[in-house]
Amino acid sequence: MYTPPLARLIEQLQRLPGVGPKTAQRLALHILKRPENEIQALASALIEAKKKVGLCNVCFHFSADPICEICRNPNRDKQTICVVADSRDVIALEKTREYKGRYHVLGGVMSPMDGIGPEQLYIQPLVRRVTQDGVKEVILAISPTVEGETTTLYIGQLLKPFTKVTRIAFGLPMGGDLEYADEVTLARALEGRRELD
């Protein structure tokens, strides 16, 4: 049905999150119709991003520098850390323009079924930041899935002896993801955060 190069392109596109067979086919056919210089620019951008974008040494958000812009910004509140599962959550919260503190990206959530425990996440660096940097509040902004709740409770118990721990209020249904929430919902969730019991 497809020539081998087209079949390989479709197969690789299907590896992207949210891209099924039909979308992969549509994208592949679109790519083939574009001028070669546009395809070269796309390929170059992919390779450059992979080579130059890593993780911030402080918060583990994506960064082209050893320390990201948010962590370097002297106007950000150093005494407040918002803990999120993924860099997409940082981007979603930043769009609200409500939060003025710093972040900590865990790199996922605890999921015993998938073999992801506390050791596979950036939890120990968070504990070090809290205990060494005089952090006054940790805001847990993790999606309210079963795994997210497990992670929230674990981190809350771990950090309570050292600082105030709150979690954002959710105007989201259980099982929802932060990245799909609108800015108003996220802003209200930040405003309505509460201390963990």
From Swiss-Prot:
The keyword ATP-binding does not apply. Keywords: DNA damage, DNA recombination, DNA repair, Metal-binding, Zinc, Zinc-finger. Pfam families: RecR_C, RecR_HhH, RecR_ZnF, Toprim_4. InterPro entries: DNA_Rcmb_RecR, Hlx-hairpin-Hlx_DNA-bd_motif, Rcmb_RecR, Rcmb_RecR_Znf, TOPRIM_dom, TOPRIM_RecR. SUPFAM superfamilies: Recombination protein RecR. GO terms for molecular function: DNA binding; zinc ion binding. It comes from the Bacteria. Coiled coil: none annotated. Gene3D superfamilies: 3.40.1360.10, 6.10.250.240, RecR Domain 1. A zinc finger (C4-type) spans 56-71. Residues 79-173 form the Toprim domain. GO terms for biological process: DNA recombination; DNA repair. Belongs to the RecR family. HAMAP family: RecR. May play a role in DNA repair. It seems to be involved in an RecBC-independent recombinational process of DNA repair. It may act with RecF and RecO. PANTHER family: RECOMBINATION PROTEIN RECR. This is Recombination protein RecR. It comes from Rippkaea orientalis (strain PCC 8801 / RF-1).
